[in-house]
């Protein structure tokens, strides 16, 4: 991995070929920035910001950065990202990519991050994002349909705001056709996830029957029924100035014994839900693709008691590689294996 002018990272290349790579250092030294580079190479965007200029090193003479990650999985992939003045170019194996669909399967990263708690206590949009990400990782067609659905909904909302109803019939037919498949994929995902999620949560949290519940905005069982429902809801949409139903309004809850779980859950139980979601995502990805993911874990053990930390690390799903960040006082060596590589990070530089 090489980074040039990226946040506070020093300009050098580090060997990340070990099965486990640990980055140890105090806060603010650059540990998370390293994981950010790996995530950037996997998805084409940061998990911390949508503002490209925030990624430029403050000491750089120009507003640009370059990162390069070589990943040897089933095939060897080299991903390079060049960014200058807010414009980004991504190359995979020296060829420019035009859509994220071309990149997303190259380095199958799953990130455990403290902001994952948003999937549990945040807005419905954040929980939908988690479902979308889980499906997009292993189903390129889902990502294509999702992008098409959002484009159609955006067009429909524009027509609604302008009170132009002539195109709404045609738009609703397209939205129903694409949206129906999205709902089917999400329904099956949650069904598959629950087999994994419930088992892991019981193992780590000593609590049975914690489940994910998916509540689609549409209850219709065919495209034709959805088209009819959208027509009946049109007056309401026009009154509200936007489309009020569809996959962009779906809800996801966590339940236990058919009651909502999160309102009564402790802080630790909520954090564990976010961790088990990511574990389930990794297992699901492997089950669908037959490939092992790369796990990125950024200071996610801090809120767990020592016993649960140990149990969590021992229960990690199979992975191709594991990248973890730790504070110096944590028992990181206990989690290492024979070939684990440990880097100590200080002021953006790594040393062994």
From Swiss-Prot:
Role played: The RecF protein is involved in DNA metabolism; it is required for DNA replication and normal SOS inducibility. RecF binds preferentially to single-stranded, linear DNA. It also seems to bind ATP.
GO MF assignments: ATP binding; single-stranded DNA binding
Organism: Treponema pallidum (strain Nichols)
Record's keyword terms, sorted: ATP-binding, Cytoplasm, DNA damage, DNA repair, DNA replication, DNA-binding, Nucleotide-binding, SOS response
Main subcellular location: cytoplasm
PROSITE patterns: RECF_1 (PS00617), RECF_2 (PS00618)
Classification lineage: Bacteria, Pseudomonadati, Spirochaetota, Spirochaetia, Spirochaetales
Biological-process GO terms, alphabetical: DNA replication; DNA synthesis involved in DNA repair; double-strand break repair; SOS response
Family under the similarity heading: Belongs to the RecF family.
Localisation: Cytoplasm
Designated name of the protein: DNA replication and repair protein RecF
CC terms in the record's Gene Ontology section: cytoplasm
Gene transcribed to yield this protein: recF
């Amino acid at each position: 991995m090489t980074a040039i002018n990226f946040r506070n990272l020093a300009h050098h290349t580090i060997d990340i070929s070990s099965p486990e790579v640990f980055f140890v250092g105090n806060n603010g030294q650059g540990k998370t920035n390293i994981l950010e580079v790996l995530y950037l190479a996997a998805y084409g965007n940061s998990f911390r910001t949508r503002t490209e200029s925030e990624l430029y090193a403050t000491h750089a003479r120009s507003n640009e950065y370059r990162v390069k990650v070589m990943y040897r999985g089933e095939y060897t992939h080299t991903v390079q990202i060049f960014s200058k003045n807010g414009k980004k170019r991504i190359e995979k194996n020296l060829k420019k990519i035009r859509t994220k669909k071309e990149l997303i399967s190259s380095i199958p990263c799953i990130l455990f991050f403290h902001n994952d708690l948003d999937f549990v206590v945040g807005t419905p949009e954040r929980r939908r994002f988690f479902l979308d990400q889980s499906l997009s990782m292993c189903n390129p067609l889902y990502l294509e349909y999702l992008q098409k659905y959002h484009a159609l909904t955006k067009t429909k909302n524009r027509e609604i705001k302008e009170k132009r109803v002539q195109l709404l019939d045609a738009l609703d037919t397209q939205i129903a056709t694409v949206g129906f498949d999205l709902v089917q994929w999400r329904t099956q995902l949650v069904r598959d996830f629950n087999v994994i999620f419930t088992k892991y949560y019981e193992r780590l949290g000593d609590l049975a029957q914690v489940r994910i519940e998916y509540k689609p905005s549409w209850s219709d069982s065919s495209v034709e029924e959805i088209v009819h429902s959208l027509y009946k809801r049109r007056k309401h949409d026009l009154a509200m100035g936007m489309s009020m139903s569809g996959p962009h309004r779906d809800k996801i809850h966590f339940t236990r014994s058919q009651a909502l779980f999160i309102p009564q859950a402790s802080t630790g139980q909520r954090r564990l839900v976010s961790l088990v979601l990511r574990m389930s995502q990794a297992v699901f990805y492997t089950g669908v693709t037959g490939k092992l993911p790369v796990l990125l874990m950024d200071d996610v053990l801090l809120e767990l008691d020592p016993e649960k930390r140990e149990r969590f690390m021992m229960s990690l799903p199979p992975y191709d590689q594991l990248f973890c960040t730790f504070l110096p006082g944590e028992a990181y060596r206990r989690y290492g294996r024979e070939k684990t590589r440990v880097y100590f990070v200080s002021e953006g530089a790594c040393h062994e």
